[in-house]
Curated annotation (Swiss-Prot):
Domain notes: Has the canonical translocation RxLR motif, but lacks the canonical EER motif, which characterizes most oomycete effectors identified so far.
Keywords of the record: Secreted, Signal, Virulence
Protein name as catalogued: Secreted RxLR effector protein 78
InterPro entries: RT_dom
Coiled coil: none
General function of this protein: Secreted effector that dos not suppress the host cell death induced by cell death-inducing proteins.
Pfam family, one: RVT_1
Organism: Plasmopara viticola (Downy mildew of grapevine)
Subcellular location(s) of the protein: Secreted; Host cell
Length: 113
């Protein structure tokens, strides 16, 4: 998601810097495909966003501990793999996951306004 946000910020900056683009159309339709959205959120970015939105550092530390050390196993040809560490993304199935994703996406929404 961080790459998507950075790309959109670059596009917006270019549109603002190019007067002919702004003159051609004062309205822009923005469509984003959040494919594998929860997996695409950089955890450090999420924690920084939470701190910027003035969530308590204690709450952010709690979320960090919840996400640190996350592992996943895969079923390949009927065999279960060894646990693999998951280093990015929001824990799927967590009741906070939709809210955390919305907060991370809010950075993009605020930059568009």
């Amino acid at each position: 998601m961080m790459k998507t946000v950075m790309m959109m910020l670059a596009i917006l900056a270019t549109a603002k810097a190019e007067p002919q683009l702004a003159a051609a159309s004062s309205r822009v339709i923005l469509l984003l495909d959040f494919k594998k959205a929860y997996d695409s959120v950089a955890r450090e970015f999420l924690f920084l966003v939470l701190l910027r939105f003035e969530f308590s550092p204690m709450f952010v530390r709690m979320l960090r501990k919840l996400h640190d050390g996350t592992t996943a196993r895969f079923l390949v040809n009927g065999e279960l793999s060894e646990p693999q560490e998951v280093v990015s993304g929001i824990r799927q199935g967590c009741s906070l996951a939709p809210l955390l994703f919305i907060l991370a996406a809010e950075v993009l929404a605020l930059s568009i306004q």
